[in-house]
Amino acid sequence: LKDHPDMDMVPRTFIFGAKAAAGYKRAKLTIKLINSVADVINNDKSIGGKLKVVFIEDYRVSNAEIIFAAADVSEQISTASKEASGTGNMKFMLNGALTLGTMDGANVEIVEEVGAENAFIFGMSSDEVIAHEKNRDYQPMDIFNNDQEIRRVLMQLVNGFYAPDDPERFRDIYDSLLNTKSSDRADTYFILKDFRSYAEAHKKIDQAYRDSSWWAKAVSYTHLRAH
């Protein structure tokens, strides 16, 4: 949007809701980053209201009940093979939200119920992830060096774009994506590897949402198959 302010896109709001365990420093830092991103985006008038970011503090059942009912899209984006099956995606499904996700956890069962044509699936399969881990052949730095957009986004983590008062605030997140430290492999969850596929899924959502007839049918079918 900054590069192409006249871009035709369906306005959207990304809603995050989570809690971090008391000693989970990276999770707390991630929440801090989400809020910093929200501050930048939500106060940028040049975006023209096309994009907003919201973080729900003190996420709990009473918050979730509102979000489940309001969401058009349920993002379930754990890396394939990494997530134990949860129930949040099922609650979104019961309320008719279409799933954007990987083939992981309960997403697999949801896609089996609604059909791949009524969901937006992206990313590597579990077998592909496991193969990369076994072969130890994934090099996120190659993506950083060859994808200008991803490189710019990551550099914003350490150049003060989101933290002018402390440019190094998000260094740990940056390092976790690019630098291997002892037993911690860089980009353990293949975030950079899956990103382009994720971005393409969002383009498909943008196109699908414009077809109100198709979207209504997909929502109705998703809701019915949840019962």
Model regions: which residues?
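Short flexible/disordered coil segments
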Residues: 38-45, 74, 80-83
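Short linear capping/connector segments at secondary-structure termini
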Residues: 17, 218-219
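Short, flexible loop segments at the rims of nucleotide/cofactor-binding pockets, characterized by
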Residues: 52-54, 76-79
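Catalytic binding pocket for nucleotide-activated donors in carbohydrate/polymer assembly enzymes
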Residues: 69-70, 77-217
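Short, well-ordered loop/turn elements at secondary-structure boundaries
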Residues: 8-11, 48-50, 63, 68-72, ...
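Long, K/E/R/D-enriched contiguous segments that form extended
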Residues: 1-64
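Conserved small/polar residues in nucleotide/adenosyl-binding loops
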Residues: 222-227
